[in-house]
Amino acid sequence: MAVVTLIPTLARALSKHSLLSPLPSVTSFRRFYRGDSPTDSQKDMIEIPLPPWQERTDESIETKRARLLYESRKRGMLENCILLSLFAKEYLHNMTEKQLNLYDRLINEPSNDWDIYYWATEAKPAPEIFENEVMELLREFAKNKNKEQRLRAPDLEYLFEKPH
C-alpha cells in the first residue's frame, strides 16, 4: 500500500519540478555541421592564428629531404598521409633544392590540410603562389593514371634498399 501512495507523489514531484520547467543549471547543446555549402557563414568556426611559414635556410639538403619525408607521412588527415607519402616516395629523392623548397612551402604554409588535398585533386584552384612545377607533379600523381592501389602509406623499407 505504501508503494501505491508513493508513486503518485513521486510523479507529481517530478512533473512539477523537472519535466515541466527547465532547470537553470542545464545548458543546452547544439551541433553544428561544418560543411562547405554555399550558405555556410562559417560563424561557428574559430581561426587559430599560426606563425607564418619561414623557409629553413640553415638546413642541409639531406636533412630537408628527411624532414619532408616525415612531414609528408605525418599529416592531419589520412587522405594526405597516403597521397603525400606516396608522392614523396616517388619524387623526393630526385628533386632539386629549388623543388624541395617549393614542396616544403606547399605542404607547410597552408594551415588547412584539406586545401592541399583539394588543390592536388583539382577540386579547387590553388592560390597563385602554389602554382608551380611541384604542384603540377602532385596533380599528375594524384590522377593515378596507372590505377595503382593507394590504400596506405608506403612501408619505409625502400629507404634502406641499395640503388639499382
Swiss-Prot record:
The keyword Plastid does not apply. This is Succinate dehydrogenase assembly factor 2, mitochondrial. It is found in: Mitochondrion matrix. One of its GO terms (biological process) is epithelial to mesenchymal transition. Transmembrane segments: none annotated. Pfam families: Sdh5. Belongs to the SDHAF2 family. Plays an essential role in the assembly of succinate dehydrogenase (SDH), an enzyme complex (also referred to as respiratory complex II) that is a component of both the tricarboxylic acid (TCA) cycle and the mitochondrial electron transport chain, and which couples the oxidation of succinate to fumarate with the reduction of ubiquinone (coenzyme Q) to ubiquinol. Required for flavinylation (covalent attachment of FAD) of the flavoprotein subunit SDHA of the SDH catalytic dimer. Interacts with SDHA within the SDH catalytic dimer. GO terms for cellular component: mitochondrial matrix; mitochondrion. Residues 1-27 form a transit peptide. Keywords: Chaperone, Mitochondrion, Transit peptide. Its main location: mitochondrion. The lineage of its organism: Eukaryota, Metazoa, Chordata, Craniata, Vertebrata.
